Amino acid sequence: MLIEVDNIIDEIKAEISSLKEKVPYEPKLVSLVVEPDESTKSYLNSQKRNAKKFGINLEIVESNDLTNDLRKYNEDDDTDAIFIARPLKKGYTELDIAKYINPEKDVEGVSLHNIGSMFYEKELFVPCTAEAVVKIIEDTTDVRGKNIVILGRSTTVGKPAAIMLQRHGRDATVTVTHTKTKNLKEITKEADILVAAIGKANFVDSTFVKEGMIVIDVGINVVDGKIVGDVNKDVSEICQLTPVPGGVGSVTTAILMRNVFRAANNKKGDMQL
């Protein structure tokens, strides 16, 4: 069974419409690209389509000096929001982005300020994909007391999703696994909800899951010219599974667009660091 995300996207669109009324101009999003792979190009194409649809001025910049470009657009009054495409070029790390990006323009929620503030629920923005994961899970089931296993410990998905799912009011029990985790299949089979965010095409098959489990597929991989997830589609025969494409990625892009309008609206002085 495939999990539908249309209702979630409609709710985000409604929020965007409300924010647009408060922003009397076309907000500008700068997407910095270093060394895009096929999955990155696919996501940027999605950005282009959605930016046009929602009335966002999207500028995609091929960056040869990410640090200097971050400084440039941090200080540019015409730029409301900044996105950094992955993968990063050798020599750059996630910490470089976290240190240099302006938290007010950090619509991905990856700055040191926003990541640190997540522990106190005071962030300006949270990572878009992690928020998409949480929204889909909450739209599908009550997470209180649920056992959730996350495959992957990235700063954009695994770690922030774990923090948000454990917050008071959600109260899930979360296990974050990684490449060094032993007895991985035994751990995943004990979960009520499995989140796959490892970037390996069709890695999760029926041997990782149990019947009736909710499986959130975060993966965007290109195989033979087609986009596939981290989860084999056959898993949908015994589990509730988000589709790829059309699942987490679609919600993530909608959240990013909403965050651009939030950043533009916050320029008026509503934001408190």
From Swiss-Prot:
Query: In which domain of life is the source organism classified?
Result: Bacteria
Taxonomically, what lineage is the organism?
Bacteria, Thermotogati, Thermotogota, Thermotogae, Petrotogales
Binding residues annotated for NADP(+), in chain numbering: G152, R153, S154, T179, I220
Which family is annotated?
Answer: Belongs to the tetrahydrofolate dehydrogenase/cyclohydrolase family.
User: According to its UniProt record, which reaction does this protein catalyse?
Assistant: (6R)-5,10-methylene-5,6,7,8-tetrahydrofolate + NADP(+) = (6R)-5,10-methenyltetrahydrofolate + NADPH; (6R)-5,10-methenyltetrahydrofolate + H2O = (6R)-10-formyltetrahydrofolate + H(+)
Q: Per its record, how is this protein called by name? A: Bifunctional protein FolD
Q: Which InterPro entries match?
A: Aminoacid_DH-like_N_sf, NAD(P)-bd_dom_sf, THF_DH/CycHdrlase, THF_DH/CycHdrlase_cat_dom, THF_DH/CycHdrlase_NAD-bd_dom
Q: Which GO terms describe its biological process?
A: L-histidine biosynthetic process; methionine biosynthetic process; purine nucleotide biosynthetic process; tetrahydrofolate interconversion
As for what it does, the entry says: Catalyzes the oxidation of 5,10-methylenetetrahydrofolate to 5,10-methenyltetrahydrofolate and then the hydrolysis of 5,10-methenyltetrahydrofolate to 10-formyltetrahydrofolate.
Copy the pathway line from the protein's UniProt record: One-carbon metabolism; tetrahydrofolate interconversion
GO cellular component labels: cytosol
Give the keywords, sorted: Amino-acid biosynthesis, Histidine biosynthesis, Hydrolase, Methionine biosynthesis, Multifunctional enzyme, NADP, One-carbon metabolism, Oxidoreductase, Purine biosynthesis
